[in-house]
Structures are given as C-alpha cells and as structure tokens.
C-alpha cells in the first residue's frame, strides 16, 4: 500500500484551515462590544481581515448606532475590494453622523475610482476639501484626460487615446468605460495583450457581462494562437452564465478546431505531409481547417469578438503548416501557400525554406544563401533541413563563377544517366564540326563548344567525377593543388618533378628532373 504523503499533507492543511476559520458561533454572546472591537482591531493588525469582519459584524449587530464601528467595517471591506458593501456602510455612517468628513472623503475616492467625476467632486466638497486642494486638482486633471481620450478615439488618434485614458485610469481605476476605451485603442494599435489585460479588469467590474469573456477567448485563441487560454476563458464564461448560447457556440467551435489542429501536428511530425495537406486545405468531401478558420475569423471580426486589425496567429500557423505539408509532399500549390505564409509572417521558417529552394532553382545563388541562412537562424533546431540546401547553394555559387557542366549540357542538377546521355547526343548533333557548318555555326566556335560539351559529358557520365563536381571540386580545374608541391612532396626539398612526353616516331621520351639533375629513360 502506497500513501501519497504530499496529497495527505495538502488535505490536512486545508482541513485545519477550514476548521480554524472563525465563525459568528465562535464569539461568546456575553463579550462586551468594546472587547469585540478590540479583537477586530487585533486581527486587522495581523492582516486577518476576514476574521476582523466577523468581530465587526458581531459588534454592529449588538450596537447598530455606533457609526465608528460601521466606518471601521467599511474600511475593512475596502481592503478586500468589496466596494459595494463599503459604500453601503459609509452611507449608513452619514445617516447616523451627517457631515462626518471621513465618510465623505472615502465616498469621494470611491466615486473618483468609478469615474463618476461630479459625484466625487461633490463628496470632496462635503469632506471640506478646497477647490485648489490636491484632491480637486487631481480629479479635474483625470476628468479632462478622460474627455481627451474619448475625443482621440473618435478621431482615430489611438496613441493619444491610450495615453490620456492611462492618465485618467490612475485616478479612475475602476471605471469600466475607461478600461473598455483603452482596450479598444490598444487593439487598434495592435497591442493585443495589453488590451486583453484591460478587459480582464472589466470582467471584475462587470461580473455578469459575458462580452469581455467572448472577446478575450476569441482573441486569445485565434489572434494570439493561444488555444489553451482561449478555451480556458470561454469555460469561465460558461461558469459565469451556463445558459449563454454565444459562450456554448464559441466553446464548441474552439474545441473542434483544437482537436483538428493537434491531429495535423501529429501527422506532420510522423512524416505524413500528404494526409496533413488534405486535412488543412480540404477535399471534395470535407472542408479543410484553413478555410474553416478563415470563415470563423471573418464572422468573429464582423461580430467584433476579434479586433478587425488584429493579426491572426492561428491562421498564420495553419498557412505555414500547409506550406510545410505541400513542400514535403512536392505539391504543385506549395508556392501559393508558402508565399502567403511569408506575406503573413516574413519570419516563416517553411516559407523561407521554400523561397530559398526557388531562388536556388532560378540561379539566384546569393539571394538563396541569404534566405536559407535567415531560415537557419530563425529555427536552429531545423538545421538538418536547411544545411543540405544551403550547401548546394554555396557550391552552385562557386560553380557559377567557373564552369557549370550541367548548364553546358542543358540539364538539371538532379538529371539521371539517361537524361545526361540524351542531352550529350542532342548537343553533339548541333555543334559537331562536321554538322555545325550546315547550321551556320563557324567552325572555330563549333570546335570550342564541342570541346566544352565533351568535357562536361566526361565529368557527368562518370559517377565519381560527378560526385566531386557536386561537392564543388571541379576535376578539370587548374586551381586544384599539386599533390607533389610544398609539404605534399614525398621526397622533401621542395623541388618539383618535371614530366615531359614527346611525340615522334621514336616513341615517348620521358624525363624526370629531381634536384636539378635529370634522369633519362
């Protein structure tokens, strides 16, 4: 039998915390009100606000006319963010003690936080604050900033809107209107995550409103590509309102997309690009995930559930996945999706890889190298896919500055033996000196061209020589190092051999010269 000690410890702690929580039944009925207030103050000093509230409740129940007890309970409510209950207590204080400045001051601050400028101004006046006091000045500045933010939004001046709204929110931190206004302007600027942060504040201020849930969920899921948090937010919407049709619809839609997305990811990781491509783009019988998401995003933007200017990261991911699937399966429409992937995201790895290949094929070697190096930098974990193509580009660039035997014969780099032989015969028929004259090709030009054709065929028809050429080593290059020079001379001394072969009827005349002394054979 195995015991989960960690689990037991957590359970025990939770049990003890519950058991030790103070309840009204724990307070002796005969404890004097003064003692109750002392106990409440002691708990407050320890940061135990909930326990303090239990004692304040008991004290007020026994003496509901004590305005100071109500005032202290109101401040305790404030510290917990329970503003509606605090406001109620402050109003009770004023009904018992009209003109109590402390209550007016607290109500002024509460109205200011809510962005209720006129009510806050009135309460500051009742609290005895002069028109030139710091509180009045701050309030007027915040009120003006809120007005300027509204005007900037209407004029499409998004940065000004965000700046002015921020100034107002310093004072009116619990104003739903200002938070929603700044969220809107931030969305227009493309600051999606900051805008969502503002909407999270709105949720706390308007707990019964499902609209922020929908915007946060849809924007997180589609615009940010954060599937987990997007679904998590719409679940909170259903917890807030289990009967919400719009929340149910969005939850079902997002779950379906997430399931298909993960399935396609698995297909690509298992090397099934053709299957993945069909799932992404669709077939005659089934719509694909890409068109489905396009349609969903269009509808969500129309309903203002996603900001109209937001980038759609989920769609960018899907387009790049399609580029990958079509590239790996050599699909004829790979260029279409890879080009779109780069338009949506200039740092698309698969888009860059496809572009680099296309540039290499078009003999844009410098551009291909730059593109492929960028791809390798973006995804260091994918270097095994980039490096072989990058090496080809470097070799092709080097070859382009010397001889290109493939180009001489007019064949592709991956041509097989049959294609090479066929190209050789075709070129020979055109440029053979005996036949070139009939086609108007000068004899000297034909001989020169035929020599190049023979040289190219000699290399490409020999697997070993061709392999060397493909690695960037031209077998006919005059720049290759002499194995008998320098340190490579097996006899030392740094003196080269001289090899001469003479013609003539007397047979070869071969001489080797070593160290300045000839040896004749």
Curated annotation (Swiss-Prot):
One of its GO terms (cellular component) is endoplasmic reticulum lumen. Residues 404-473 form the J domain. Residues 489-508 have a biased composition (Gly residues). Residues 464-474 have a biased composition (Basic and acidic residues). Transmembrane segments: none annotated. TPR repeats lie at residues 33-66, 67-100, 102-134, 176-209, 211-244, 315-348, 349-382. It is found in: Endoplasmic reticulum lumen. Residues 509-521 have a biased composition (Low complexity). Keywords: Endoplasmic reticulum, Repeat, Signal, TPR repeat, Virulence. Residues 1-21 form the signal peptide. Pfam families: DnaJ, TPR_17, TPR_19. CDD domains: DnaJ. Residues 464-521 are annotated as: Disordered. The TPR repeats mediate interaction with unfolded polypeptides and the J-domain is essential to stimulate the ATPase activity of the chaperone and to increase its substrate affinity during the folding cycle. SMART domains: DnaJ (SM00271), TPR (SM00028). This is Tetratricopeptide repeat and J domain-containing co-chaperone DNJ1.
């Amino acid at each position: 039998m195995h015991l989960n000690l960690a689990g037991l410890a957590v359970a025990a702690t939770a049990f003890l915390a519950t058991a030790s929580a103070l309840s009204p039944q724990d307070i002796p009925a005969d404890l004097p009100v003064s003692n109750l207030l002392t106990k409440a103050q002691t708990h407050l000093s320890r940061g135990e606000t909930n326990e303090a509230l239990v004692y304040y409740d008991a004290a007020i129940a026994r003496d509901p006319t004590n305005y100071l007890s109500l005032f202290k309970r109101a401040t305790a409510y404030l510290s917990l963010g329970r503003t509606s209950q605090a406001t109620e207590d402050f109003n009770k204080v004023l009904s018992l003690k009209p003109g109590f400045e402390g209550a007016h001051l607290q109500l002024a601050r509460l109205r200011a936080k809510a962005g209720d400028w006129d009510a806050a101004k009135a309460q500051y006046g009742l609290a005895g604050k002069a028109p030139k006091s710091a509180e009045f000045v701050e309030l007027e500045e915040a009120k003006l900033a809120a007005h300027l933010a509204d005007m900037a939004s209407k004029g499409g001046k998004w940065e000004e809107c965000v700046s002015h709204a921020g100034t107002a929110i310093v004072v009116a931190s619990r104003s739903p209107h200002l938070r929603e206004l700044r969220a809107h302007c931030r969305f227009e600027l493309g600051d999606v995550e900051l805008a969502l942060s503002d909407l999270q504040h709105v949720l706390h201020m308007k707990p019964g409103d499902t609209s922020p849930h929908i915007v946060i969920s849809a924007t997180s899921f589609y615009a940010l590509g954060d599937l987990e948090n997007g679904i998590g937010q719409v679940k909170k919407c259903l917890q807030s309102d289990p009967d919400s049709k719009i929340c149910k619809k969005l939850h079902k839609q997002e779950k379906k997309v997430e399931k298909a997305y993960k399935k396609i990811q698995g297909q690509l990781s298992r090397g099934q690009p053709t299957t993945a491509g069909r799932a992404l783009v669709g077939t005659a019988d089934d719509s694909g995930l890409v068109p489905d998401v396009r349609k969903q995003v269009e509808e969500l933007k129309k309903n203002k559930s996603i900001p109209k200017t937001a980038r759609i990261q989920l769609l960018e991911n899907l387009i790049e996945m399609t580029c990958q699937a079509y590239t790996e399966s050599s699909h004829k429409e790979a260029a279409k999706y890879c080009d779109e992937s780069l338009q949506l995201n200039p740092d698309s790895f698969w888009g860059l890889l496809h572009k680099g290949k296309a540039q290499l094929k078009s003999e844009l070697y410098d551009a291909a190298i730059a593109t492929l190096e960028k791809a390798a930098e973006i995804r260091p974990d994918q270097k095994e896919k980039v490096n072989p193509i990058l090496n080809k580009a470097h070799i092709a660039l080097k070859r382009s500055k010397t001889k290109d035997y493939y180009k001489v014969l007019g064949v592709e780099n991956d041509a097989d033996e049959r294609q090479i032989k066929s190209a050789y015969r075709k070129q020979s028929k055109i440029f053979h000196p005996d036949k070139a004259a009939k086609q108007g090709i000068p004899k000297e030009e034909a001989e020169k061209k035929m020599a190049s054709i023979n040289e190219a065929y000699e290399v490409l028809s020999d697997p070993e020589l061709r392999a060397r050429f493909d690695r960037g080593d031209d077998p006919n290059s005059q720049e290759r190092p002499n194995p008998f020079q320098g340190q490579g001379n097996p006899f030392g001394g740094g003196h080269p051999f001289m090899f001469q072969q003479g013609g003539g009827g007397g047979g070869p005349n071969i001489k080797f010269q070593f160290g300045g002394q000839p040896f004749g054979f």
